[in-house]
A protein has these predicted regions:
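Mid-domain alpha/beta scaffold segments of enzyme catalytic cores
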Residues: 1-312
Length: 312
């Protein structure tokens, strides 16, 4: 039976659990959340009520014009959970992968190949439409762990190409190395830089290769002028949007738990910054998203859900 959550969000000793923000004004034209983590429990109500489970979060998202989400795995367990949820929930497609920060420890234990084989098996399941999040993260990993990250990244690229799936890139402090690996191995036809964090020149380089750039709530942050310059350089046909929930909550709710239903804040901010109509931008991004992952309705869900939820 699939549980409503797999793990709680890690918080520091001095960090309190905050309540979820209120619903935004619904979008007139719906969009899709390119990247979220519904398996992570976070937040609560003003009176100490429980966190929103994934169904409640999806219901809120639907009510404000977020038609569907890509639920993203970061290890074998969360990837299995993601594939299982997608198989039974029509608003969810799955991405499966080992996060780059998982690779060094798995390699040290001699388990990397076994876990990569598990990802390859999940890639063949219905409604799994992407391999991700994979890539390189040199922020937390030292020199001794980089070879394992590169090996894992290369293997994920091959899995994506073998199954005809999109690739979701995690790139932190590793822009040049990520591009070198993609150029050397050969990027899948539909490659997405999730939570794009580069400058305007890197945005142009990524776009010139035909890859997609997905912007999260970080683009709304006061100190993110460089990221907004990058946004301006992206062709509209290569632009996606995401929450990376429960992280990176957009302004004006930064510091509170994030969820897919808050995506309208980021969409409207991006539209205003780009000097375009929010509905026109939403329509373009929705079209781009379905070009990357296909239509959410293309594969039927399983009729009987195995999900074990309180009160269901």
């Amino acid at each position: 039976m699939t549980e409503p959550f797999l793990r709680a969000r890690h918080r520091g000793d001095d960090e309190k659990v905050a309540e979820y923000p209120p619903l935004p004004v619904p979008l007139t034209v719906p969009v899709f959340d390119n990247h979220t983590h519904l398996e992570i429990e976070d937040g609560g109500g003003p009176d100490g009520t429980a966190s929103l489970d994934f169904r409640q979060q999806l219901d809120r998202a639907s009510s404000v014009g977020v038609r569907g989400v890509v639920q993203v795995g970061t290890d074998l367990e969360t990837s299995r959970w993601s594939a299982e949820i997608a198989a039974h929930e029509p608003r969810v497609l799955a991405a499966v992968a080992l996060h780059p920060n998982e690779a060094p420890e798995l390699a040290q234990k001699g388990l990397l190949d076994e876990h990569l084989a598990g990802i390859a098996e999940l890639a063949a399941r219905p409604r799994v439409r992407a391999i991700g999040e994979t890539g390189l993260d040199f922020f937390r990993t030292g020199e001794d762990g980089r070879d394992a990250q590169v090996r894992s990244f290369e293997a994920h690229i091959e899995i994506a190409k073998q199954h005809g799936l999109a690739l979701q890139i995690h790139d932190r402090d590793a822009h040049r190395d990520v591009v070198r690996v993609l150029d050397r191995v050969g990027a899948p036809e539909r490659t997405v830089f999730h939570c794009f964090s580069g400058d305007v020149e890197f945005a142009r380089e990524v776009a010139a290769r035909g890859w997609y750039l997905s912007f999260a709530g970080t683009v709304t942050f006061k100190n993110a002028g460089g990221l907004r310059e990058a946004l301006e350089a992206v062709p509209r046909a290569q632009l996606l949007i995401e929450t990376d929930a429960p992280y990176l909550t957009p302004t004006p709710w930064r510091g509170r738990p994030n969820s897919s239903y808050l995506l309208p804040h980021t969409l409207r901010f991006m539209a205003e910054h780009l000097g375009t109509d929010a509905s026109m931008l939403a329509a373009q991004i929705a079209s781009n998203t379905e070009l990357v992952y296909g239509r959410w309705e293309d594969e039927p869900v399983t009729a009987t859900s195995p999900l074990s939820l309180e009160g269901s």
